[in-house]
Amino acid sequence: NKGGKFIFGKSLIREDLTIHLPPQALTEYNATAEGKVYLFTGSKITGGFCVTRKSLLEPSKLGHILSANPALLNYQTSEGEFIKYKGRSYCWVSISRTGIIQLNQNIIDFLNLEIGMELLSIRSSDIAFTMGAKGPLLERAENYDGEIKIY
């Protein structure tokens, strides 16, 4: 379909506030390479959050996000502590070798997420992928006949 978004799968927000990111997204973005990832607020429409890592973000045209926020660049903020910058908010969290991220109540509340929610994992750019919480893409996924794997 024209302008279709590639879907990696869905990730469940588990009781222990962990999220297992879809394997294909992990591979494409080499997301576990640094042991830490940046989360930033998603679009108003899709909500949720986007996932990237330092070596993807720093050399990109969005690298100023890190150069303007050295505490974020050097992981000196607390894990899951959001810093607001130019209309979006950014934090870092650890990621396991198998692609599990541990959220905390602060992140859940800040992003309006809840336990049991299924986030739709979407390829958004060559810098980040999106874990969407709402909006037309999620509605289309709900009505999709094929299988979307849940992690």
Per-region residue spans from a language model:
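Short, solvent-exposed secondary-structure boundary motifs
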Residues: 1-3, 28-32, 78-85, 107-114
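Short beta-strand-centered segments at strand-helix junctions
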Residues: 14-30, 95-112
